[in-house]
A protein has these predicted regions:
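Proteins enriched for Cys/Gly/acidic motifs involved in redox and nucleic-acid/cofactor modification
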Residues: 2-250, 289, 326-337, 361, ...
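Conserved SAM/AdoMet-binding glycine-rich loop
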Residues: 117-122, 129-131, 234-357, 368
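Conserved, mostly hydrophobic/aromatic
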Residues: 205, 225, 242, 278, ...
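Terminal RNA-binding accessory module
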Residues: 5-7, 12-15, 20, 34-35, ...
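A structural motif corresponding to the C-terminal lobe/cap of the Radical SAM core domain
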Residues: 300-302, 314-430, 435, 442, ...
Length: 483
């Protein structure tokens, strides 16, 4: 039998949820990323594999991680067997997200045994959790380096100490630090880009782990964002998606500037880039200026992801969402009036602790009223350290699943209705490339963020083309390219 590879960490800085919960009145500093010369070239002739889970925030972070690694000389690979360094950029949002990562880490052990020089790293939101770190030490003691969401910039030092000095470290900061501008970035796409506009979240929805794993809300300066979008436009990018956990809180932390998300959208809409999207919006903070900017800005796409979570006022209150069903519906009405044809998508949690049949029916009735054209629906998952994890939840697993199925059945009918409205119409599609399911078809997204499959040998990735929609389904549409 091969010996189990077990790592004892040479240095440990472990996360603390208690520390992470606190919000300090400290000014945000902006720092530039610099790669120290001793870290250059240590990845030469070595390959890395990055496995990313979770939201767009993590996808964007992974592009920075890849940028840093390539600056250090590493080159990318697709197969675990070829890798000298495997990094898991993880998500902690629900228990099943965590289980997936642990499953993958368990599976990776065999590569560690085959290649004793393989380095394994873990970062992202799970690294910010105390129980994850405990579990790593106990059950997966072959991970070489652990770092958190607040210190991606530490990666070169951690790789260096593990690879060159054979010192393995856990290095997780519980409290957010400076905003790093000019991080190296290796963008996945040549025509669609993520642009972080802010970090962290101060909403503290009672079910959610994000305010603990991502720290307090910190906005990037408008000039830096505008400059980045201008550069992307110049480089031929067709679409940018502005990122933040609660983009509508953008700018609220500026002490010297009265500048909000609406102002930013207005300014960005003047840049010559075809498509601007953003995610995610918090319904309470979505204001008139933002709606006006969406209505006026020709390049602000007519799609809004506005997570409602529940249709019951009682549950919204227990979730600490700080808006009522009526206020949410008012905003939807305003959006539909000011931006005719806007597509609205959402997130919904079922079986939140104490959710009664009546509460759940309120959610169903809200779905009928809004007619969402897309949604992510979840069964509530308790997160250690969040208030809701201590609330009583008497529902059985079967009852929870039943609610999810019932909700999905209803909501899917509106996905179809939302796409049917485009049958026979001509829409603009940003071409993504080959369809995953059918190599003879191309695929892309409309302005309303709906997937279209079509056949053509004349168009290429990154083109914005006109398509006539021939058939609509719940999850996608078929189209024909119009000359
Ligand atoms: N900041 C965004 C996204 C947060 S995470 C927002 O506020 O909308 C994405 C979604 O995951 C949430 O909208 C919520 O529906 C879901 N979610 C978050 N925590 C959850 C939990 N503990 N159990 C189940 N779903 C959860
Ligand atoms: Fe989580 Fe709420 Fe913040 Fe979204 S707004 S990240 S759901 S705490
Ligand atoms: Fe997951 Fe963290 Fe994003 S918990 S959803 S990766 S902010």
């Amino acid at each position: 039998m091969k010996k189990k590879v077990t790592i004892n960490y040479d240095e440990e800085l472990n996360p603390s949820i208690k520390e992470a919960r606190m919000r300090r009145n400290k000014d945000v500093n902006f720092t530039s990323f610099i790669l120290e010369p001793q870290y250059l070239n240590i990845g030469l002739n070595k390959k890395y594999l990055l496995k990313t889970y979770g939201c767009q925030g993590n996808l964007a972070d992974s592009e920075n991680i890849a940028g840093i690694l390539e600056l250090m000389g590493f080159s990318p690979c697709n197969e675990e067997i070829d890798a000298d360094l495997i990094i898991f950029n993880t998500c902690a949002i629900r228990e099943n997200a965590e289980e997936r990562v642990f499953g993958e880490i368990g599976r990776i052990e065999k590569f560690r045994k085959q290649n004793p020089n393989l380095l394994i790293g873990l970062c992202g939101c799970m690294a910010q959790e105390e129980h994850t770190i405990e579990k790593i030490k106990k059950t997966y003691p072959y991970i070489n380096i652990v770092f958190g969401t607040h210190n991606i910039y530490s990666l070169p030092e951690l790789v260096y100490s593990s690879l060159i000095e054979q010192k393995n470290k856990i290095d997780v900061l519980s409290i957010e630090g400076d905003i790093y501008e000019n991080m190296p970035v290796k963008r996945e796409s040549k025509y669609k880009a993520w642009v972080n506009i802010m970090y962290g979240c101060d909403e503290f929805c009672t079910y959610c782990i994000v305010p603990y794993t991502r720290g307090k809300e910190r906005s990037r300066r408008p000039e830096a964002i505008i400059e980045e979008v201008k550069e992307l436009a110049k480089a031929g990018y067709k679409e940018v998606t502005l990122l933040g956990q609660n983009v509508n809180a953008y700018g609220k932390d500026f002490k010297d500037l009265n500048y909000t998300f609406g102002n930013l959208l207005m300014d960005l809409s003047k840049i010559d880039i075809p498509r601007i999207r953003y995610t995610t919006s918090h319904p309470r903070d979505l204001d008139d200026l933002t709606i006006d900017a969406m209505a006026l800005g020709k390049n602000i796409m007519p799609h809004l992801h506005l997570p409602v979570q529940s249709g019951s006022n009682e549950i919204l209150k227990k979730m600490n969402r700080k808006y009522t069903r009526e206020e949410y519906l008012d905003k939807i009405k305003k959006l539909k009036e000011k931006i005719p044809g806007i597509s609205i998508t959402t997130d919904i949690i079922v079986a939140f602790p104490t959710e009664t049949e009546e509460d759940f029916n309120e959610t169903l009735s809200l779905v009928k009223e809004v007619e969402f054209e897309g949604a992510y629906t979840f069964i509530y998952s308790p997160r250690i350290g969040t208030p809701a994890a201590t609330y009583p939840n008497p529902l059985t697993e079967d009852e929870k699943k039943e609610r999810l199925l019932k909700l999905n059945d209803l909501i899917n009918s509106y996905f179809l209705k939302g796409r049917k409205r485009f049958e026979g119409k001509i829409v603009e599609v940003l071409v993504d490339g080959e369809s995953k399911n059918n190599k003879d078809m191309l695929t892309g997204y409309t302005e309303h963020n709906m997937l279209v499959n079509f056949a053509s040998n004349k168009v290429k990735e990154g083109d914005i083309i006109k398509c006539k929609i021939t058939k609509a389904y719940s999850w996608h549409m078929l189209g024909e390219v119009v000359e």
